[in-house]
């Protein structure tokens, strides 16, 4: 607790002398020991393991920019649930041009009667991200070669797209990579036939790869 200037009352404030002492020790260190974070490791647990106190948990964020920017890695046993919660919708892939149709917020219905709301569309991948109202969307919008669509209320005309692929969002393709791990664009309106040299990376795989990087 500290008094600041002539202000009445006291305020909670971190003990900066403790922080400065640790920062100086880190800055004066000539070497660092590498450690791979294991499932179940927490900052306070590792602080106690290395320093004999839980007080220095924040040093891991200080000296590891990737953790500071992206957060502590998720335990492996929690990762799938985290992925489903982060990407809970359905992904529909179509070769039809959706750039001007299927606006975000539009209600759409497939041949099998499943209805949902367009949350996002990615025309360069031919993808519609649709929320069917379930907490974790498990009800599919139908098999391939069926259609999903809506009625344009201005023109009073039906707008449809043929389903090439449909899956849970977390299992759908986030991007394609070449052999150098670089993102590669697909040929427009031929989204189901990527070059054989390209590797598809799903939302789930991307999160798992990112999580592994945070452990180092």
Describe these PLM feature segments.
Residues 1-216:
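Cell-surface/extracellular proteins and modules involved
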């Amino acid at each position: 607790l500290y008094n600041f200037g002539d202000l009445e009352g006291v305020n909670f404030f971190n003990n900066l002398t403790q922080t400065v002492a640790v920062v100086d020790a880190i800055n004066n260190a000539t070497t660092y020991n590498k450690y791979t974070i294991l499932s179940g490791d927490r900052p306070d647990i590792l602080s106690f393991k290395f320093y004999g106190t839980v007080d220095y948990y924040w040093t891991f964020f200080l000296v590891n920019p990737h953790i500071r920017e992206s957060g502590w890695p998720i335990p492996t046993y929690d990762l799938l649930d985290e992925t489903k919660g982060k990407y809970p919708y359905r992904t529909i892939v179509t070769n039809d041009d959706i750039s001007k149709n299927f606006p975000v917020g539009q209600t759409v219905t497939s041949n099998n009667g499943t209805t949902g709301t367009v949350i996002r569309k990615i025309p360069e991948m031919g993808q519609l991200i649709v929320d069917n109202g379930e907490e974790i969307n498990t009800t599919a919008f139908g098999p391939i070669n069926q259609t999903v669509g809506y009625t344009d209320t201005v023109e009073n005309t039906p707008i449809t797209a043929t389903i090439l692929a449909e899956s849970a969002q977390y299992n759908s393709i986030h991007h394609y990579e070449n052999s150098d791990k670089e993102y590669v664009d697909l040929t427009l309106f031929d989204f189901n036939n990527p070059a054989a040299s390209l590797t598809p990376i799903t939302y789930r795989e991307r999160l798992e790869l990112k999580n592994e990087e945070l452990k180092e």
